Curated annotation (Swiss-Prot):
It comes from Plasmodium falciparum (isolate K1 / Thailand). Homotetramer. Interacts with TRAP (via cytoplasmic domain); the interaction prevents substrate binding and thereby inhibits aldolase activity. Interacts with MTRAP (via cytoplasmic domain); MTRAP phosphorylation may increase the binding to FBPA. Interact with RH1 (via cytoplasmic domain). Interacts with RH2b (via cytoplasmic domain). Interacts with RH4 (via cytoplasmic domain). Interacts with AMA1 (via cytoplasmic domain); the interaction is weak, however it may be increased upon AMA1 phosphorylation. Interacts with EBA140 (via cytoplasmic domain); the interaction is weak. Pathway: Carbohydrate degradation; glycolysis; D-glyceraldehyde 3-phosphate and glycerone phosphate from D-glucose: step 4/4. May be an effective malaria vaccine as determined by epitope response in sera. Antibodies against FBPA inhibit its catalytic activity. GO terms for cellular component: cytoplasm; host cell plasma membrane; membrane. This is Fructose-bisphosphate aldolase. It holds the Pfam family Glycolytic. The active site is at residues 188, 230. Plays a key role in glycolysis by catalyzing the cleavage of fructose 1,6-bisphosphate into dihydroxyacetone phosphate and glyceraldehyde 3-phosphate. Gene3D superfamilies: Aldolase class I. The gene is FBPA. It catalyses: beta-D-fructose 1,6-bisphosphate = D-glyceraldehyde 3-phosphate + dihydroxyacetone phosphate.
Amino acid sequence: MNAPKKLPADVAEELATTAQKLVQAGKGILAADESTQTIKKRFDNIKLENTIENRASYRDLLFGTKGLGKFISGAILFEETLFQKNEAGVPMVNLLHNENIIPGIKVDKGLVNIPCTDEEKSTQGLDGLAERCKEYYKAGARFAKWRTVLVIDTAKGKPTDLSNHETAWGLARYASICQQNRLVPIVEPEILADGPHSIEVCAVVTQKVLSCVFKALQENGVLLEGALLKPNMVTAGYECTAKTTTQDVGFLTVRTLRRTVPPALPGVVFLSGGQSEEEASVNLNSINALGPHPWALTFSYGRALQASVLNTWQGKKENVAKAREVLLQRAEANSLATYGKYKGGAGGENAGASLYEKKYVY
């Protein structure tokens, strides 16, 4: 039997230690790795020009928030941000270190169509990844993220077996390359909420996808103790007319994880997937209320941590302090949800606004 080569002991130990820190009790990950194109959409909503200076100001707002490290363990950055400084000349990475927040980096290069499929997607970025990982590590990154996308369409048989295999194998190759270069890989197989499918269909598809992913991780020799999973919660499609409860989401999500995710994995950091800020917190709470679990179940939210922050900031310096208060409020709500102790209501009515975008591109 030809097994993959083992990682050196010191590398394995470093990866496992970092992974555990990222999912430490009461903390989650801030996903701030929007591409330049995606952050333009965010800025357009508040009528702010998408310049490098404005992007730096916004990231400075987020990472310079005093007390953020109480609720946030890591922050995923876009490549520009990893090497960026704020207006005062302080590197963004240093702002994170000041709060004991671990910097991470988005390493995928976006989506392309898989040939011979009905526009199912493959993720680019494996070419040159090892060299980039070395540079990112030197710049202070200690973990990475790679997003894949699948769509449910029962009438068309999506996701196909080919899509499942492509997703799983690409994630496993990425994870292996990251670990060889001392970066903890966050493995993100996102099943989009697009469509009218039921929550039960989402559960079946998610179970199959995660089974494929962990099979591929094993075949590629990925150290599970030094990796994290970033999946969708099990929810109904956005256009589904059947009503579901947060308890349904909690039960089916936990059941799916128990059927597929080995306990060697330190933690699962859920994506918000277009849920409102409040939904993302309440559903995370329902998931953790069903504990104890063999892994930490926490969050890696982008829109569900930032939407109200952006709306409060509006690109104006005089709004920075208030926007930071909003960020802390939302981060604390999700921290409470990791214990199953969130009672709801943080952020008021605005936090209930849908953040769904069809065919979401990050």
